[in-house]
């Protein structure tokens, strides 16, 4: 019997392991789970290198939003080590100037001790409209922001602004791929997911009904099921 495949989870911007809290107990039944540290560097290449330095020799990789951007960079650096990849609520495209300008404005607020204000600005776009006043969900976002902190947030935004366009390398991804998106994701809309899936041979595209950008927390059962099916395929 082969050894269980380790699973590495990369959270999104201003997010921690709590982003995957509903999935982690179920994923452990498939293989050992680790949460990547994406808070200490301000370049995508350095973030990917740091994760790869401590990751198992071969593993399944899951990234949501910024985690997906990092996953693309890891696939550039060490494709032979990634046995499977799941790209959730993310995009293969680089920032456009308007996005970078928004990030710089948020970084300024964060540097002034106004990170909570940044989160309040973002929340309406992060979740499905029906969940915008969900107190429990808002509390999870607030706790994650506290865990990451302003300095790491600024490093993360710097890395995101400097990331490469990954569309040209989609065809080089040979491992089993899951591409998943919430049907109401405003930040990385379903069209971005379809673009990724179309570029990766054999990729499975899953759209989660009633979810915005943070599908793991908004529709946890559906996302868990999709991940388990991907791991077993």
Task: Tell where the protein language model's regions lie, with residue ranges.
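Conserved HGGG/HGGXW glycine-rich cap/lid loop of the alpha/beta-hydrolase fold
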Residues: 2-50, 64
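Flexible "cap/lid" loop of the alpha/beta hydrolase fold
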Residues: 44, 76-77, 81-120
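Gly/Ala-rich beta-loop-alpha elbow adjacent to hydrolase catalytic centers
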Residues: 63-67, 71
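Conserved alpha/beta-hydrolase catalytic His-Asp/Glu region
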Residues: 95-98, 113-172
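Short beta-strand/loop motif that positions the catalytic acidic residue
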Residues: 173, 179-181, 185
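Conserved alpha/beta-hydrolase "acid-adjacent" motif
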Residues: 186-192
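Catalytic histidine neighborhood in serine/cysteine hydrolases
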Residues: 194-213
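Catalytic histidine-centered segment of alpha/beta-hydrolase-like enzymes
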Residues: 211-224
């Amino acid at each position: 019997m082969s050894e269980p495949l380790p699973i590495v989870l990369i959270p999104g911007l201003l997010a921690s392991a709590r982003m995957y809290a509903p999935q982690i107990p179920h994923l452990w039944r498939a293989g050992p789970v680790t949460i990547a540290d994406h808070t200490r560097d301000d370049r995508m290449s350095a973030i990917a290198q740091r994760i790869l330095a401590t990751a198992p020799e071969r593993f399944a990789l899951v990234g949501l939003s910024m985690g997906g951007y990092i996953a693309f960079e890891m696939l550039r650096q060490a494709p032979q080590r990634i046995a499977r990849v799941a790209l959730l609520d993310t995009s293969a495209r680089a920032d456009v100037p308007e996005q970078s300008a928004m990030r710089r404005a948020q970084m300024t607020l964060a540097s002034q001790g106004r990170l909570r204000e940044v989160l309040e600005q973002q929340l309406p776009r992060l979740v499905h409209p029906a969940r915008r006043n969900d107190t429990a969900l808002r509390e999870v976002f607030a706790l994650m922001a506290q865990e990451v902190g302003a300095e790491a947030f600024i490093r993360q935004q710097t890395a995101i602004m400097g990331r490469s366009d990954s569309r040209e390398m989609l065809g080089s991804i040979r491992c089993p791929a899951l591409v998943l998106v919430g049907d109401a994701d405003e930040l990385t809309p379903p069209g971005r997911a379809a673009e990724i899936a179309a570029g990766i041979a054999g990729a499975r595209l899953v759209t989660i009904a009633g979810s915005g950008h943070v599908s793991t927390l908004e529709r946890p059962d559906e996302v868990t099921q999709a991940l388990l099916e991907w791991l077993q395929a």
